[in-house]
From Swiss-Prot:
Chain residues that bind Mg(2+): 76, 78, 80
The protein, known as: Phosphoribosyl-AMP cyclohydrolase
One of the GO biological process terms: L-histidine biosynthetic process
Transcription in keyword set: no
Functional summary from the UniProt entry: Catalyzes the hydrolysis of the adenine ring of phosphoribosyl-AMP.
Co-factor remark: Binds 1 Mg(2+) ion per subunit.
Subunit structure and binding partners: Homodimer.
Provenance organism: Ruthia magnifica subsp. Calyptogena magnifica
Amino acid sequence: MDALKQTKFDDKNLIPAIVQDFKTGDILMFAWMNQESLALTIEKQQAVYYSRSRKKLWFKGEQSGHTQLIKEIFTDCDNDVILLRVDQVGGIACHTGRKSCFFQQLDKNNWKTVANVLKNPKDIYE
C-alpha cells in the first residue's frame, strides 16, 4: 500500500492520530496508530488504533459500541501525523462517557470540566 510507505512512523513504529467529528469539526480524541492499525483502518473504513499501555491493537468501540466510521483520512505536510475525520457512532468518543476526550479547559491556573457526561462509563463498559 503506497500510503503506508509514504507515512512516517516514529522510532517505535507509531504515528499520532487526531480524530475529528466529520459533521461538526469538533476534535474528539487523540490516539496512536501503528502500520497494522492504519492499514486496517483504511481497509475496514473503521478506526483501529494501537494501545501503548496494552501493547495491542485497539478496535475503537469494540466494547462500548461507540465505533468511528471513517469519512476522510488526511496526513500533515510532513506525513508524520494522521487526521481521521469520522462519524462517531453513539456520539461518545471518550471512555469517560463524554463526546470528546478534550473536556477540560484551562481556567486561569486550573483545569475546569466544560462538558457533561452523556452516559455513565459503568453503563458503557459492563
